[in-house]
Design a protein with these regions (language model features):
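Generic structural signal for well-ordered secondary structure
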Residues: 3, 27-30, 46-49, 67-69
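A short, surface-exposed loop/turn module that caps and links secondary-structure elements
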Residues: 41-64
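Arg/Lys-rich, positively charged N-terminal/basic patches that mediate binding to nucleic acids
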Residues: 1-33
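N-terminal, well-ordered alpha-helical segments
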Residues: 32-35, 54
Length: 92
């Protein structure tokens, strides 16, 4: 279950549907990803086809990422079956 966000625009999109703080062309994919994140109870629940689920390293150690489009990713921390600090970023 989603517990917290880092990205204010993504948080607004999740709660209100406003696209002001996200790339509008990513809206459909973001809805799909957020729905899966919110329902997940294990990290394997997030390893759906095309997700590109991977554990980050270096300064983002202990965070996971799933692919949105191109270089855009949803990153988050997974702990005890919950999702924290959800971010929407182009980190490459």
């Amino acid at each position: 279950m989603l517990k917290s966000f880092r990205h204010k625009g993504l948080e607004d999109f999740f709660y209100d549907g406003t696209k002001r703080g996200i790339q509008p062309k990513h809206a459909g994919k973001l809805v799909d990803i957020i729905d899966v994140l919110n329902a997940a109870t294990t990290i394997q629940d997030l390893n759906f086809p095309g997700s590109g689920l991977h554990l980050l390293q270096h300064k983002q150690a202990n965070r996971w990422a799933v692919k949105v489009s191109g270089n855009w990713r949803i990153t988050f921390r997974f702990e005890d079956g919950d999702i924290f600090e959800v971010d929407y970023e182009d980190y490459h």
